[in-house]
C-alpha cells in the first residue's frame, strides 16, 4: 500500500515522520505527473509546491485556520491532502474536479477566483473579521512572486501591516508567473535568495554582547537601532519590514522540514509575517525542468514518460494567427509596440518579442498599469497593442474608460480567450467584454470569424487613429475560412436561403467566431422551408447602419453571440433598431447572466443553449409564433428545401 493511499485529510499528514514525508512528497509528484498527463492542467506550478503544501497542512489546522491560494492553479496538492485524490480522473472535466479551489468541493477551499493578486486582500478582511469576533484563527495566504507584481497585493500589505493580526503570507518564489517574473520586485527577491542569513548573525551578536556586563546590552540596543542600515547592506529584506511585516527566509521550498520550521516560527509570532520560500517550477520532473518556455505551466494530454503531447494537431489556433500577423505588422510599422501582463507566450507575443525585443513590454500581473502605460505610449507617438486574456481586461475597466477613451488615444486591445473558454471555469470565461465595453464612448470592437478576418480586422484596428479599438477572438483552433458571398455596406453576407413562397424570413446576425454555428443553424432552418439570411457585421461596436435596412427587409432578427445577453451585441442592435423606428421583432441568443462551471467548450455551449440544433429549434419556434398556418407549402413534409446560397463546402464538411 502506498503512503498516499492512507491520506484522506490534513490530520493524516500531521502524524508522519520526516522520512515518511519525503516518501509522500515523491508519491504525490508521481501521482500528479500521471494524473495531469491524462487530463491536462497546471502541472509545473504544482510540482513546485509539494513540500510547501505539506508543511502548511502540518503547521496549520485547516479548515479552522484559513488557507488562501492566490490564483489557485497551484492548489492540486492541497486538493490531494484534503481527500480528493480519487477525483483527479475528472480534473477539469464536466462535472469533475475543478482546476482551481472550489467552495462546492470542500470546506478547505475558501476562495475560487483564479485572477491573481487577490488573496492578500481576502486575508486582510478575514483576519479583521476574526479579530472583531474574538476568534483565535490564523489566516495563511499563499502568493506567488509573479502575483506580487500586482498592485493589489501592495495595497493589501499596507493594510495588513497596520494591525497585529495573525496573518502568515507564504511567498512561493519560483521566479516565474507564466514566464520569468520581471521588474524591480523580481530583482529584490533575487537579491534575497542570494543573501546570507542576517538573523543568524544578529542572534550571535546578541548572545555575545549579552554576556558583556554594563556595556553589552546598551551596545546591542544601539546596534539594533541601526538594524535597517545593516540589513540594507547585508540582506535587502527591508522592503517588507519597512511596511511593518516580519520577514522569515529565504527558505528552501523543497525542504519540508525547513519550511515547516519557518511556518511554526511565523505562526507563533502572532502578527503579520512573510515566509519567503524559494521553489522551482516543475521540480522533480525533468521534462518540466528543462522546458525553458514555462516549465510546463499548463499542459494538454501528454506522455508522462517524455512530457510530449500525445497528439499534435495540424489545426492552427487563433493565437498563432494573431502572433504571425502582429509580427508582420511590426515589420511594416516601427511605431507598433506591444504590451502584456505576465502573459507573453500565452497571448502569442513570443515571436514578436524575439523579432523586436525593444518593442514588447511585459509589465507583470498589472493590467491597470498596462492600459494606462499604453495610453502614455500613444501620447508619445507610438501605436501600442495591449494583449490580454479577455477576462483580465475586466480588471482595468476604469483605465480603459478614463485613461484611454476619454483621451481618445489610439490604443488597440487584443483580447484572447474571448467567450466561453471551457476547462478553466467560471473566472476564465471571457463572456463580459462585449457588454462592459459597450458603454465606452469612442471605442470600436471587431469580432473576426476566421483567420482572414482576424488578419484584416487586426490591421484595421492598428490603422485606426481616431480612438481605442478592440479585437476579440476565442480560445482554441480556427475553423475553416467562411468567405462572404456579398457585402451590404460594411456587413458581410455569409448565407442566403432560397426564397420560399409565403415563408417569413429571418435575418441571423452572427457575432465573431459563432459564424460556423450560425451557418449550420441556417441550413437546419432552411430545411424547414424558412427563408434565412446570415450576416456578419465584422465590427460590432459601433454597429453598421446597413443592419437597419437589412432588418427592415426581414420579418425576424436573431443575434447569436458568445457573450452575456445582458448588454451584449443583441441588446445594442435592439436599441439601434428602436432608434431607427424599425418595428421588427428581435431574439438575442447569448449566455445567461450566471457563472459557468468548467467543461469542454462544446459541452458548455450546449448547456447554455448555443448548440446549433438548439438554436435552430428556437428560431423555427419563433417563426411559427409569428405567422399563420401555411396553406400552400411548396415543400412536402418529407422533402428538404433546396440548399441555400453560400460559399464553400457543406457545413458538415467544415466541422
From Swiss-Prot:
Q: Which residue ranges are recorded for the region named Disordered?
A: 626-655
Q: Where is the composition biased (Basic and acidic residues)?
A: 646-655
Q: Which UniProt keywords apply?
A: Isoprene biosynthesis, Magnesium, Metal-binding, Thiamine biosynthesis, Thiamine pyrophosphate, Transferase
Q: Tell me, what is an example of a GO biological process annotation in this record?
A: 1-deoxy-D-xylulose 5-phosphate biosynthetic process
Task: Give EC number(s), comma-separated.
Answer: 2.2.1.7
User: What remark does the entry make about the cofactor?
Assistant: Binds 1 Mg(2+) ion per subunit. Binds 1 thiamine pyrophosphate per subunit.
Cofactor(s) recorded in Swiss-Prot or TrEMBL = Mg(2+); thiamine diphosphate
Assigned protein family: Belongs to the transketolase family. DXPS subfamily.
Q: What does this protein do?
A: Catalyzes the acyloin condensation reaction between C atoms 2 and 3 of pyruvate and glyceraldehyde 3-phosphate to yield 1-deoxy-D-xylulose-5-phosphate (DXP).
Which PANTHER family does the UniProt entry name for this protein? 1-D-DEOXYXYLULOSE 5-PHOSPHATE SYNTHASE-RELATED, 1-DEOXY-D-XYLULOSE-5-PHOSPHATE SYNTHASE, CHLOROPLASTIC
This protein's name: 1-deoxy-D-xylulose-5-phosphate synthase
Query: What is the species listed in this Swiss-Prot or TrEMBL entry?
Result: Frankia casuarinae (strain DSM 45818 / CECT 9043 / HFP020203 / CcI3)
